[in-house]
């Protein structure tokens, strides 16, 4: 009898199964690993403005801040002939007619650009965008707004956004060591541009911080605080310690996250002795209070992962910070192919020990349509990156839906692909919906970039805009 032997009693018993092996072998994959990209610090001396800069100067946070590029003239002075004249003129026009953020780029970030081809360089594209890169017909979506997530609407006190039931965002300061062109807080962060007069905090800084702490003491449902800005790297470390030590004394606070793009953009800041001592004091106090504390950073391109960044990350991890996590933004022309995303995630994970955490669909701020992706494109990207990274390090691609919050891109409740309108639901009320009986049953809309729509959908939005302009032109 097949696969059986017979005992002396005449009863059949199964034989031990045998398996053939050796037929499996590595297959060709859409993404190839290991990476070909080197983990190196680019030589800053290739850049004309930095040719005589010593290693000691380059690794000095004070030198980096003092020589940060603050305008296009300084950008040209740093890059010299590496910045093509036509690109200079294109960026200059963008600064006049489209930019929602001022230019502020530390030398370290300039050095991360591919100076052999600045036109196509992903870092330049989002730090110093050119006018010709913007969408020519729809630079802004008709539904775009300066505070696209309505964070200020959810301030119980100035600068503290209470959107989720148990979590808040503390906007400590309105400045960063570097300004990204796609900043979701363009209404608040940075100095004015030709297009945008920024909101200015009304309370004095210390009064604002004390009001935040007082609200948290009075609101025991909050357990999780994201300490952001701006960027915490622009908060003097002793002042940051003072705020955090008071925060740690609030019994309901169990998780704290410090948000800083400067960990990548200005790692020299985090390698200063006084900053290292301050951050070590912070994590020790958090552990004494049995509070989990982590750091969130913002890296969008694989070439931004360098040894200086890795040193700064390891210093924080060695102190006892739970994680350093990356929250990137999907930006067309920067990182919206599976190859781009996977290469970035492996560089973060393999070399810098940073956890790929989230990639956000770029928010609907003014003049950002050329960067934004459609929901279906984000869904395709999520599918394409599955299976390569460890499960715990596979980033979730999310959309931040106004009045809803983060949603995985596959959680859409309805989707009109022609008009590019997706619909989303939620299971909690924001802090401005406490008396709204329909908050948990309403469909909340989100909008794809118009250029990603079929012609019928684009025609719909052209007609919509024409009607809007008609209303604006009617006499009052």
Predicted regions and their residues:
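Flexible, acidic/Gly-rich N-terminal and inter-domain linker regions that tether
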Residues: 2-162
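C-terminal accessory extensions appended to soluble enzyme cores
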Residues: 2-20, 26, 378-476
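Active-site glycine-rich loop that binds ribose-phosphate moieties when present
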Residues: 119-120, 126, 203-214
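Short helix/loop capping segments that flank catalytic or ligand/cofactor-binding pockets
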Residues: 180-182, 191, 267, 433-434
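N-terminal pre-triad scaffold of radical SAM enzymes
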Residues: 102-105, 153-186
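Conserved AdoMet/S-adenosylmethionine-binding subsite of the radical SAM
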Residues: 206-220, 224, 230-389
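Short cysteine/histidine-rich metal-coordination sites, predominantly Zn2+-binding motifs
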Residues: 196-204
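Iron-sulfur (Fe-S) cluster-binding segments and ferredoxin-like electron-carrier domains
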Residues: 185-195
């Amino acid at each position: 009898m097949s696969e059986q032997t017979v005992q002396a009693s005449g009863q059949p018993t199964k034989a031990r199964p045998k398996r053939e092996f050796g037929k499996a072998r590595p297959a060709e994959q859409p993404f190839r690993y290991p990476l070909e990209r080197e983990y190196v610090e680019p030589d800053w001396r290739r850049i004309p403005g930095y040719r005589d800069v010593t290693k000691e100067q380059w690794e000095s946070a004070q030198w980096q801040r003092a020589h940060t590029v603050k305008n296009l003239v300084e950008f040209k002075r740093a890059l010299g002939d590496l910045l093509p004249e036509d690109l200079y003129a294109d960026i200059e026009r963008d600064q006049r007619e489209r930019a929602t953020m001022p230019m502020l780029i530390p030398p370290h970030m300039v050095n991360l650009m591919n100076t052999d081809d600045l036109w196509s360089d992903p870092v330049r594209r989002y730090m110093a965008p050119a006018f010709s890169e913007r969408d020519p017909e729809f630079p802004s979506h008709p539904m775009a707004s300066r505070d696209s997530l309505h964070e200020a609407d959810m301030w119980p006190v100035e600068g503290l956004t209470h959107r989720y039931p148990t979590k808040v965002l503390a906007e400590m300061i309105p400045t960063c060591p570097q300004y990204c062109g796609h900043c979701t807080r363009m209404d608040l962060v940075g100095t004015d541009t030709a297009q945008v007069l920024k909101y200015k905090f009304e309370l004095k800084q210390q009064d604002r911080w004390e009001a935040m702490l007082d609200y948290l003491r009075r609101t025991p449902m909050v357990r999780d605080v994201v300490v952001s800005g701006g960027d915490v790297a622009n908060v003097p470390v002793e002042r940051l310690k003072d705020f955090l030590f008071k925060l740690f004394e609030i019994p309901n606070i169990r998780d704290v996250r410090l948000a800083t793009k400067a960990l990548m953009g200005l790692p020299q800041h985090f390698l200063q002795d006084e900053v290292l001592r301050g951050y070590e004091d912070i994590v020790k106090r958090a552990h004494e209070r049995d509070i989990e504390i982590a750091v969130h950073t913002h890296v969008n391109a694989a070439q931004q992962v360098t040894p200086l960044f890795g040193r700064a990350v390891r210093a924080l991890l060695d102190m006892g910070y739970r994680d350093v996590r990356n929250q990137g933004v999907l930006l067309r022309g920067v990182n919206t192919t599976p190859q781009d995303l996977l290469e970035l995630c492996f560089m973060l994970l393999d070399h810098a020990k940073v956890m790929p955490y989230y990639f956000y669909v770029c928010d609907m701020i003014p003049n950002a349509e050329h960067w934004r992706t459609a929901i279906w494109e984000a869904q395709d990207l999520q599918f394409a990156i599955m299976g390569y990274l460890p499960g715990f390090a596979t980033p979730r691609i999310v959309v931040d839906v106004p009045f809803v919050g983060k949603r995985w891109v596959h959680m859409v409740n309805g989707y009109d692909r022609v008009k590019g309108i997706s619909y989303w639901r939620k299971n909690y009320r924001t802090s401005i919906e406490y008396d709204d009986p329909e908050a948990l049953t309403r469909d909340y809309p989100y909008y794809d970039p118009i250029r990603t729509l079929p012609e019928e959908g684009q025609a719909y939005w052209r007609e919509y805009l024409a009607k809007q302009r008609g209303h604006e032109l009617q006499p009052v």
